[in-house]
Amino acid sequence: MKTIHVSVVTPDGPVYEDDVEMVSVKAKSGELGILPGHIRLVAPLEISAARLKKGGKTQYIAVSGGFLEVRPDKVTILAQAAERAEDIDVLRAKARKSGRTPLQSQQDDIDFKRAELALKRAMNRLSVAEMK
C-alpha cells in the first residue's frame, strides 16, 4: 500500500516521523483526511488528536494547535506542543483539567482565555492518552 511521510515537529524538536497510510487531523475548517498524493495544502489546526494509520493500526498524537503543511509525498505538522499517546503524563493532564476554577470566575478576560486553552489542551491530552 502507498504511504506518505509524516513529521510532527514542535519548538522543542521532532515528536514523530514515519511513513503512514493516512493522516487525519482537525483543522479550523473541519476534519481533514490525507492520503498519499494529496494536493498541496496549508491549514491552521485545532487543539485535537492527529490520527496516523499504518498497517491496520492507528497511532494518536495530542496536538496543541499549529499548522499543517501537505505535499503529495509529505505531511508536516508544526505544533506549539505535541505528545504521543504513550508519552502523556496522565496525572499531570488530570491536574491541569481540574483547574476549572478560573473558568468559573471569569475575573479577567485574558486569564479566562488562557485557562480555557489550558483546559482544552489537558482534555485533548487525556483523550489521546486513553487511546493507547
Swiss-Prot record:
Its main location: membrane. It is found in: Cell membrane. InterPro entries: ATP_F1_dsu/esu_C_sf (IPR036794), ATP_synth_F1_dsu/esu (IPR001469), ATP_synth_F1_dsu/esu_N (IPR020546), ATP_synth_F1_esu_C (IPR020547), ATPsynth_dsu/esu_N (IPR036771). Gene3D superfamilies: ATP synthase delta/epsilon subunit, C-terminal domain, F0F1 ATP synthase delta/epsilon subunit, N-terminal. SUPFAM superfamilies: Epsilon subunit of F1F0-ATP synthase C-terminal domain, Epsilon subunit of F1F0-ATP synthase N-terminal domain. Produces ATP from ADP in the presence of a proton gradient across the membrane. F-type ATPases have 2 components, CF(1) - the catalytic core - and CF(0) - the membrane proton channel. CF(1) has five subunits: alpha(3), beta(3), gamma(1), delta(1), epsilon(1). CF(0) has three main subunits: a, b and c. Belongs to the ATPase epsilon chain family. This is ATP synthase epsilon chain. It comes from Bacillus caldotenax. The lineage of its organism: Bacteria, Bacillati, Bacillota, Bacilli, Bacillales. The gene is atpC.
